[in-house]
Each structure stands twice: as structure tokens, then as C-alpha cells.
């Protein structure tokens, strides 16, 4: 492996923020980044050289390049970890980190004494990586040897690799070395893998070693040796020299002399680590990373130098290897590599760096975590490393320690090592992981690696510093140096008969190492290994050392590590045996079998990992799942402060990190290898399926990014492993969850061992292979230190697992072997009491055997969770184990079920308790049925609260203990934020592209006190206006109280004054106004009213009142999705009726506007824009716009609509609303305030007293110039409703209730002839001439009733439809459907029944069947025909030929009914009919009837009575208010006092109710109108006048409300009543009609009066009325009420166009516009015209009410900042979070709006393709199935469900209702005829039925 001094970017951080908190780690990292040459990639000489160069680099702080994008970035992103944790993090924003600084400094290290061959800066060459499988054990030996003596190129290569890794870590990119390492790791074992394995092993070992050192140093917290001394200065000078030389790429040069004594170097290192930097150090931060790295490398070099003696530091292993006929060169290379890797690169894997940065933990901790991860993930490969295994462990005792802790801390980070390499070296890695676990540094490294989250091979990952450090470590007895340990290991290796047979050496070594492993893991697996070299003693010492070591300073730790070389050697021996065993597991079945024996022994020593290897392969995955996060977290934090740091980051990790280990870590390679030993075939199968399955499962269960790792095991797993590690470490609490996942993974592995290849790939990609190999060696060395540390950690983890799974829950060692086919693993778990938990020993092996599990939770291997995982793996491998893992896969779901049997072998019920939450006997089916049962509570909590992810995760800070939005206001940053107002200006200038006056910043202060009028309506206290044309952009910013962080100032509103071109705005204003005014369907919005629902801010005139129209996709609560879920051809811009052209035009306008607004939105608020387009591809159907980049799903057009203070709660949580404003022509000039304008208000804010620059004078200047308009209390007109507007729900309930009552009454009438008789008696009064008309009427009724009724019905529905609320619904039953609508409450009102007369005691008069022989009924229709041709045209056109007969009958009847009573009744009825005819298409005809009535009042009278009934019927649909309004108008206008009196007397109280609902008496009155018209002609004439609302309309207008309580109407009613003999009838109907008329007349604001006025004229234009019959129904009824007002009928017809009927004037124009407005009652007043009328009456009173809202101005803290949007402006705000409103206009007129607000928004849930049709269909299918089931059940029970459904639906449904009673009533239709002629009862029942039906019967009548 030739050293390629590729230029490495300067590693030294320009900004402290660029590097992890652990400067030492950084330094090491940088060293690792440097080429092997720089790192001293070989012997101590190289290290020294590198040290020389490093000092040079560190002396000179690298500067930011100033040209890259990050350097040019001025503002911190505010979202990265460094920004979020600004108070604790000393690193610069990641987005601002210089690209050059990210790159590691190129430190060419020429003089690599030990490793003459340099390694590529970016890692070993592909050929190097691919040269062969890496024998981690051998590599470990070689590294140790290399540290001590070998100047082999392997060391250089390792150094280079380390540098590459460091570089890659720093750059967050995998070093080129990864693929190679992966390849090497992928290969099981190749004896001749010196170079490649060296690099890989070196990487892994370096990582482990460094992690161990880092962990030890961080954990022990060695006190700094002291302040920098002259020696330190000398060292620093030399470091600078070497650094500079490294940068230059040459090691040449005269390095300043410096003491190279190991103790001196250690002391300097300790000092440097504790913040003592040389005087000339210019590095940011407490430590000089480069210097630390250099020192470590120097130490390593020194150690290596001492070892370089033939085998001084190679130690026993190297010597033994050489003595044992190992090629010296190979041994040296291996040792060099080992030493190199641990010394420099190990600490600075990208994963560790990333972890350190992201988790805000020290680099040491991160490295330790990473090392643990890699160790756990990189299991020793028995075959690959068997020959060299003994050497490597011995070689890299320190490295192993480092790696081992790192594995312990970060099993996930282990993945960074190339997965291939890991797989190749899994066994070694496994050993390493176990051995490394104790080492505290490794966790640091792991953490760091995790932070980097980039897959790197261990070699790449390990900085050159690690190699030096490894050399240093070996030199120190305390730290099991590779040489010593290697020697010991080599002694064991002697047992290993040849380097090619590392298994033998491992077995020999395992004699002692087993004991160590046991002690560390406390698992049964470790017990078998107790036999090994010095395991127990070493372990104990290691524990102690680990504890002490953690307490020691880094230097002390290093020294101690060096001192404990013996222990480490023993440990290495054990670990090597363990690794060897694992290698066997991973080796071919034969090899695995051979290794199994050996591995059992060495596995025992490395039982922490070794037993895990076999047992872990399957169980490891489970462990990973359960414990990865928890175990790692717990273990890492517990062992050392780094872990604590990880814990600190846990919450974040929990948020963003998956509970499970990274996929790479979760890889099943270890498992697979174990199975390979047992069953390679099985492993192959499992590997193929398990890794993906496991990953999938993990992804599913933990929502981890396992998919990536699955897809690319090498790269993704590595990355994922690191990420997972970070997440897991940060989320130790999740470790248990992850452990569960790990168990599952283990189950997968056990079940499917095919995943091994992928697992290997994963490990390779993660770079864990090398690390694993190195870790294996390291773990052997750390067996003592690391094992001791790990032992403590593992004990903690074990306790955790015991708490979860039970202390005794452990798999017997044999259990694992049974699965693995390895007796030793079984023995180990069973034999080693330490492995009580199923995972302890298995954890590490699973890491090796099951990379996913291991990678997922390296900590698990170290933790009880790891042990438990190991035990689980054992269970997996052996049915004996109480927790056997069962792997079931179905598609992408793989369920690893651990049979939590309290089996004898598993021994302890305690093991099960851990899984108490899990199903006792998990299965795939069980998982599919209830996946949550398989998750631990923390995992469930994560899954159960995904909504939080949906919530904006805004940056946090430490400015305040807890953000209290009530005090500081809503907190969000997606509009923009910064530390100061000036930063906001810079930000907006950058976005907008202009500076200076073009951008205006206004500060506002959040008060939390809402400014509103006394009525609760919006007001403004300050108005921000555009100052000049130069001002292009205005931003409102809020200073967050108590904050001084990066997000102390946030943007709350952005106003682009020229958002769209002026020409576009003008055309849009015209087009939208014309289209929407005519065809728009207003939307009822809660914000249109105040809290009391009593304000009339939208205006009192329904024809001009402000309205809101919705277009595009919106949420439907019915569909629980987009309202177009069922629409095959959605009409997003639907208008009333069929108007495709208008809809297309509107669509084009809005789509084009959305397309043009989106870029502006993107420019001004890029983050919010991006949030809204994230799901564009998925839900493109629910998006507006013609081009890519569609942030909006819907648009609301508000035309003079006053929106009361509200928040758009259903908008996208992290999105904004974009409001495009179009203003009237007189409000388009800058600097001129229009007479009437609408403002956008923020009621909770007040204006700051200073401008953006903090100047009060500047603010005053703005006020003077008009930029800020300060308002004061001034009188404002208060528009108030007479009664609170009903909500849609209330209206529906009332409508249903009324319908139910009517139906009930109908039924009663049908059943009881008494009522019918009463009605007939009354009718008799009206029916003075019943004979002919009745007969004729019968046939006519028979024929026409359905048609006419349908017409009427349509009319009533039409009225309903006219209201936007109603839409196109035209319920047949006014009681049911119409009543549901607020505007059609008339139909639902009791008045309707009373109008029909059947419900009320006066039911007869309306139909006139009883009193008058069908005359009243027929006359209504036929009178329309007979009275006047025009009327005939109306009603007769609809009527059959018999209608003319009816007309003639009516005429005759009218004549016959010459009596006053008949006339009065006729008049009343005619009035009523007129009203009804206005309401109905027939009402137009009935309008004609009134006209006819005028000429022939007598004739009309009988028919008018009928019409009155019709009117009443229509009145039902139109709701009595119409009739009442017309009648009232008539009463006002009518000259016949009798009629008016009768109407008034009974009608006023009756007809006028809240919301115009008529009382039953009102109903009676409605009926009485027949009598009203029945009186004599004069009454009829008066009635004409009465109907002649047009003539009297003005008066009615003025007194429109009075009929509600006005004397005029009363008088008129009184006169009518006096004239009408049948007061009951006349009073009922006449009063209704009179009441209706007066109100309508006076309420010409309501379309009804206008229609009355125009009704007479409209009669002629009945066709028009019919076209919009429903609109004109109410009006036409009113109009019909005034027969004399035919001229007004024409307007009425227009009114029909817009059912807004109530107009100030009956004029056609006003009627037309008003009618539409009338149609739509923004206040739901349409429920009854009476309400509208009464409202208008009160409005007059209210108009006199004024308010100055003085209380708002007395308190300066009451908010009310308003912005005056200009024509074409675009306003952007977070409407979901900010309370906002729009002020009411003085004179709203949506026909010519003062302001049109086009509000573009995106609903939070409109993210389904095809409008969510699939979801809807699924829902419907489910409902259908349920219905079918209910039907089946009902059939079984003999219940008729249909009846029930009919009962409900028909009860409320118009059609259904009609069907049930109406069907019967329809049957009675003939009866009705007969009843009409013959009996009241029969007639009543029939007519009532039709009455209920409302349509057909009424029409015919």
C-alpha cells in the first residue's frame, strides 16, 4: 500500500465550531486525516515525523478560504446542531463551515519509519483494500508491532488510511478507502492480507485503540500534567514543523528538537487534552486538535520505536509471530498498521466526529462510542484473521482497547468501517469489539464517528493519530499495547500453530482471554473462555483500569494503557481467541467448526463479544433492536462523560434518530458468520434475506433509515450505522427499544443467515470490518483495561437488560452453539455467569456475526443489552436458550421473535420480564396483526407520536429555560430569523436582491392583548402603509423577549408591495368581481362573525354584503380528506349552476396567479415554500399552479369580507398563507388613503417605539410621513344583528326538528279527522264557492299537483340552492332538506306546516280543501292561471290542461266568493299565493295570480285562498318569512285594513319569530291568508296594494322591520283582519303574508321584498322567475303577495336570479344583486325571512349605535397593528400561528368590492394522490362491509334494517321523508281530491302528506 500524500485539506479548524468539542479527538482526527506519511503511518519515526509536521500545522491556525459558499454565507442556518445549541456548542454553523477547513489538513509524512509504505491520504488504494481479507487479529499484532518497531508500509498505509478516514469523517464523506476495506472485509479470511488487512485492521484497530484511549482519557479524566512547559513548547514547535511539513507533503526538514520521552509526550498530551495549548497555538477551542493528534502519533511513534526493535513493541505477539515463522515483514507490517491505526486515525472517524458534533459530546466520547460501534459491528473474522489474529491482538492491545470501548460505546459507529472489511474481519472485530468495549476512548471515537455519520472503513476511520496513539498505548503498560498484548497474544498464537491459523492462536490466547471476557461480559459465553491466557485477572484489572482509566486524564490514560499492556495482551489473547472463534464462525463451515472450538476459548476471554459472535449472530439483531439505542446510550454515557454528552444529545437523537441501530450496524454479518461456522448455507440464505428484512423491520419498528443500509449494505449500513450509533448513543433510552430490534435482528439473522454477505458489505461500508479487526486486536489488548471498563459498562447494560429481560435471562453458552453450531459459544454463555443476559456475550459476536445488530447497537455489546442480545443470539442459535429468536419474513417485513420462554437454559424468568411488553410468543402474524406489541414502550412512544415530527421542529436555545409562547409570542422560523434586526435586513436583502430603502423593517412587540371593538370585531390602532414607490418590501419582525440567540428576532410578516404586475391585478379584479358576483357560491366561515355571532360586519344587505368564496381543494370532514375524493372530474373552481365558461375563466385566472405567486413566495420565504412543496409530487392533484413548484392547495377569494380574529389552524404547520390583494380603483394610489379601505390586522401586536435601527426619531419621522398611521378612538358605526346568527349545526338541528314536528303533525292529521275537520270548517269560510272549483281543482290537482308541486318544490329548493350554503341541493322535503339550510329554514320552520295548514289548526285554509271545495288549493294554482294570463303563464304553463279548468273554477269561485270573507280570504290567500309564487317557479305564475287577483279579487279570493295555501306551501319552502314579509309588505301597502289587520293581528306575533320562524299560530296565519284574500274585492284591491309592494315598497323598506313590530304593518294587518271575516284564516294567512310582506317590503334589503315589488312585473316574466325559481321563490311569494306590484315582479324575476331577494328597492337591478346576496345569508338569517326582516328592523335601530372602542386606546398594550395592503401586493404570514383579522368596511359591496383578498394556502393533510380517492374507497369498502355485516345480523335476528334506515333518512331526507309519509300521501292524492271535495279529514290527511312533501302537493294545490 503505497503512501499517496494526497493533499489533505487543513484539518485544523478555522473555527472551533467546525470540530467536536473534544479537541484532542479533533487533533487526532486531523492526524488521521493526514496521509499516513503525515500521521507517521508506520513506526515511531513516522509518528515523530508526523508529529513534527503536525506542530507546524497546529502552530498556524488555518484560515477560512473566504471564497467557498459556506464562507460567503453570512447568516447561520439556525437549524443545525451547532446553531441550535449555540450556548453549549462552540462550533460554527455547519452551513458556514469552510469547505477547506472541513477537509483535513494535508500533512505529508515522509518519514514513516515503522511504516515505510505510506497509505493513501484518502485511504488505502483499492488494491490495498482488496488485496485480501483482513485478519484483524494479525492486523492487531502487526499494528502493535508496527507501533513498537515495524516501519512497514502497512503502518504507513494505515496512517494514510487513518488520515483518509479522518478526512472523510471531517468531510462527512466516506474515504475512498471504504470500498476497498469493504471488499477486504467482505472476503472471509485471507492469510495473506497483510497490507489490506493491515489497513483495514489498522483502521478498525486504530479506531478501537483511539476510542479506547479517548474513552479512557475522557472517562478517567486524567488531570492535565500541568501548564505548558518548555518541553511542551518544544513539542509544539516540533509539531508545527511537522505540520507544516505535512502540509507541504514532505516530512523532510529539520524538526526542532524536542523530548521524545514517552512520559513527556504523555504529559504533554494530557495537558493538551485538558486545554493546555502551547503558547503559540492559534486554534479555536480549548484544545489544539492537531497538536493532540501529533502528540498521540508521537507517542505511538515512540512506542513503535521502542517496539521497532526486532520486536520490542511488536511485543510478544510480533516476536512470537516471527518466532512462530510468521513472516517478519508481514508481522511488522501488521504491527505497523495496527499501531498506526490506533495511534492517529482511530479517534477521528467521521462517525465519531459527526457524533461529537451532533450530540454535542466530547470528541473523546464520540470516538469511544464510534470505536465501540465499530467493534460491535466489526466482528473478528475467524478465517481471515486466524493466521494473524494472535499477532494483531497483541500488536494492538491499545488499539483493541480503544476499539473495544468504541465498539462498546458505539457499536453503530463500528459500521463506519467498511462492512466488507467488517465482515471479513468480523470475528476479529468481534474480538475487538469485546476487547475494545472496556476502553473508554473508543466510545469517544464511536461518538465522533457517529456524528460524522459517514461510512468509513475502520482504517479510513482511524486517524493516523490513532496509529501513533496506538504506538503510544502499547508503550504504556497500563494501556495494553499492541506489542505486549501481541506478544501475549503471540504466545497464544504459538498455540495457534501458524499465522495462517489464527483460530489456533486465538484458542490458545483464549485460555486467558476467555476469563477476561467473562468478567467483562458476565455472560455464560464468557465462562468457557475463562480458561484463556489471563482473562479473569486481566479483566478484573481491566475493569479497575477502565474505571480508573476513565477517571484519568487522556495522557494518564494513555500511559496507563501502555502500562497495562500486559493486561491488554492477555485480554487481546482472549479477545483474539474470541475473534478467532468469531472468524471461524464467519469462516467456511469447516473453518467455523474449527474456529468454534478455538473461538469458544478465545471467545470466552472476549466473551463480551466473542460469545456474542455465535450467539449474537441471531440474537444480536434482536439486541440491536432492543438495546442498540438504549444500550449504547446507557453504556456510553455511563462509562464516560462522553456518554453523558451523548445522553444530552439523546433527546435530539430520539427525535431524529431511529431507535434501532443503523442498518449497517444492524447488519447480520456477525450473525451470519456465526451461522457460517454452524451453517454457512443457512447464513447465506439468512444474509440475503435477513439484513434487508431486519433492516426493514428495524425501519418499520424504529423508523430508522435502515432502508438505505439495506439497499447499500456497505455504504448505507455504514452511514446508517454511524447515524444509528449516534442516535442510539444519544438515545440510550432507546437502547432497550433498539435492543428489542436487535433481538429481532438477531432473530432475523438466526432465521435467515443469508444476510451475512450483505451484512459483510454493510460492515465493510461502515468501515467496521477493519475496525472490527483492529478492535479484535485492540479488544484483546483492552481485554484488561477495556474489559474492566466494559465490564462496568456491560454490567450497567446487563442490569438494564436484566431489568428489561431479567437478570437471569441469559442464554446458556450451549444455546448459542446449538444455533451457531459452536459448542464454545454455548458454553461461554452458560459457563460465564456474567452472561446472564441473553445479549451480553452475544452482543459483540452479533456485531461480528450480525453486523446489523452489532452496528445497530455497538453499545449493546458492551451493555447488558448487548449481553442480552448475545444471549438472545444464543437462544437463536440454540433452541435451549430461553430467548430463542424466530425469524419470520413477509415481503419487506421481517419479524424476529424471541421466544421468551422461561426455559431452563434461559433459566430466568427475569429475562422474559424485559420482553414483558412484547408478545410472549411473537410471530409474524402477530406482528402484522399488532406491530406495536413487538415494540418497547419508548419505541411505541416514538411511533405513537409521529405528529410531533409533523410539527415544526424549530431551533431551540438556552436563552430561557422554557419557551413560553404566551409571553413571547408564537415561535417559528420558517419565514426567517436572525440574532438581530440588522441580520434580518441582511437576510431579506439577500433574498430580495435589493438594498436600502427598497426594504423596510418594522419592529412590532407582542403583547398578547387582543385589540377588538366592544362587539368583538377587528379594529386597528396603528396602520403601516407604504411610504413611497421606492419601498418594495416590508417586513414585520418581532424581538423574542429574553432571547439573545441566533433566532432572537423572527419575521412574522412579509409584504411585497408589488407582488404582481399592475395590469394583471387590474384584469383579475374585473374578472373575479364579475364572475364571482354572478356565479359565486359563498362559503360560510366562522370568522365572519364575532364570538357572540351578533355582528353585521359583512353588511346587512345580503345582496352586497361581504362574502368569502373557496376554490381549489379543501378538507372534507365527511371524506376525511380532500372534498374531491369521489370526484372523477373535480371542479376546483365550481360556480353555481352549469357555467363551464365562467368556471374555465376563473380557473385560468387562479391557476395563472398561483403560478406567478409561487416564485415570489419562494424568493421571500424559501424555507416555508420548501415545506409546502415537499409533498407536491405525491399530492399534485391537490395543488394549484401550472408549473413545478406548487405550494398551494386552495385559494379563498374574500370580497369585502371582514374576517374576525382567528388562526388558520388547519393550514400546513410549517407553511404560510400568501395573500394577493386587489383593491378598488380609488384605492390604488400610493400615499393616498382611500375613503373606505380594509386593513390586515395583527390584533396581538403593537408598534415599537423605535425603528429598526433603534431610533425613536426615525419612528416619529415615519409617522409624520405617513408610513405609520397612528389611529385614535373615534366613533364607529356598529352593525348588529337582532339575534345571534345560527351556526350551521344549529340550523340543521332546527330544520330537522321542524321537519320532524311537521311530519308528526302530518301523521296526526292523517290519523285524526278532527283537525282536518277543523281545517275544513275554516276553509269553508274561505270556500264559499267550493263547488265547481273543487271539482275542477281535483282533476287539475291530480294532473298538475306533481308538476306544480315539483315546480314549487324546485322553487323552494332553488331558493335553497341560491344560497351558497345549500349549493345545488334541492331537497324534495322542505321540512327536511330545506330546513337543514340556514337560508331555507323557512321550509323547515313550523310555519310551513301551518302554511300548509295541516300542521296548524288552520291547515285547511291553505289548501282550502275543507272550507272551500279545493278552491283555495286549486285557486292558488289556477288563480294564477285564471286571474291573469300572466299568472297562467306561470302556474298554468306548469299546470296541465286541467289547470285552465281550475282557473275557470277559481274565477267562478272568486266571483262566488264575493263576500268580504271570501274576498278577504282570497286576498289573503292571493297575497300568500303571490308570495309563494315568487318563491316558486309557480310563484311567478302566482305573481300573475295576484295580478289576476287585483282585477278579480272575488275570483281570486277563493283561488287566492288556494294560492295563499300555495303561498303557504311555498311559504314553507320560502319559509314563512317570505310570506310574512310579503304579507307584511302587503299589510303595509295594502289599503284594505281588514286584510292587513287580520294579517297583522295574527301574523305579526305568529309570523315573526326569531329567524323568521313562524309559530304554529303563524302557520295558522299563513293559512288565514286564504281568508285574507277571501274577503271582498276591495280587500283584494287593498290586497293588490298590499301586494303592490313596489308602490309601498319604500315604506315597507323603511318599515320593513316594523311589520315585525311596526305600527304600520300592524295597522294594515289590523285593517286586513277587520275586513277579513275569518280572522283565523285571514289572520293566519293574511297576517303571515302581511307580516311577510311588510318585513319583506321594508326588508327589501332582503330579496323578498324586492321580489314582492317586482312580483307584479315579474309575473309577466315568470319564465325568468322559473329559471331562477328557487331564487325568486321567496321573493316571488312576496311579490305574489302584492298582486298590484307586477311592475316590481320584473325586478323580482331578477331577484330570482339571486335569491338574495331583500333589497332596499324592489328595482330589478337591486333585486338581482340583492337576490343573490339574499340567497346567501352570511349570518344564516335566511333561516327565516322574518329574521332578516326583523333583523333589518333592528338594523335600523342598530344603525344608530356607535362605538369608539375607547378601551382599546386607553391601554397601550392592547394590540392592533394593521397593514394596509395595496393593489397587487402579496402578503406572506404564518396564519396558522399568528392571530390575524381584517377590518370591516363601512359600506361593503361585493359587487364592487373595496378589496379582494386572494388567500393561497395549503391544508396540512392534503397529501394524498388523486385527492385521496384510494383512502376514500377503502373507507367506503369498510363501511360497506360493516353494513353488509349489519344486514346479515339483522337478517339473522329478523330485523328490518331498511326500515330503520328509512326511518332515519326518510325522516330527515327530503326524498326519504317524502317517500315514507308522502308515499302514503301520494296514495292519498286521489283522496286529496276527494277529500278536497268531500271531507276535511280525508283532504287533510292527503293534503298534509303533500304538505310534508312540500313540492308536489303544494304545487298542485
Swiss-Prot record:
Where is it mainly found?
nucleus
Which CDD domains does the record match to this protein?
TET3 (cd18897)
* Residues the entry annotates as binding Fe cation: 1206, 1208, 1780
Residues recorded as binding Zn(2+) 1, renumbered to this chain, are 65, 68, 71, 98, 1043
Record family assignment? Belongs to the TET family.
Q: What does this protein do?
A: Dioxygenase that catalyzes the conversion of the modified genomic base 5-methylcytosine (5mC) into 5-hydroxymethylcytosine (5hmC) and plays a key role in epigenetic chromatin reprogramming during embryonic development. Conversion of 5mC into 5hmC probably constitutes the first step in cytosine demethylation. Selectively binds to the promoter region of target genes and contributes to regulate the expression of numerous developmental genes, including pax6, rax, sox9 and six3. May also contribute to the regulation of target genes in ways that do not require its enzyme activity.
**Name assigned to this protein:** Methylcytosine dioxygenase tet3
Q: What is the lineage of its organism?
A: Eukaryota, Metazoa, Chordata, Craniata, Vertebrata
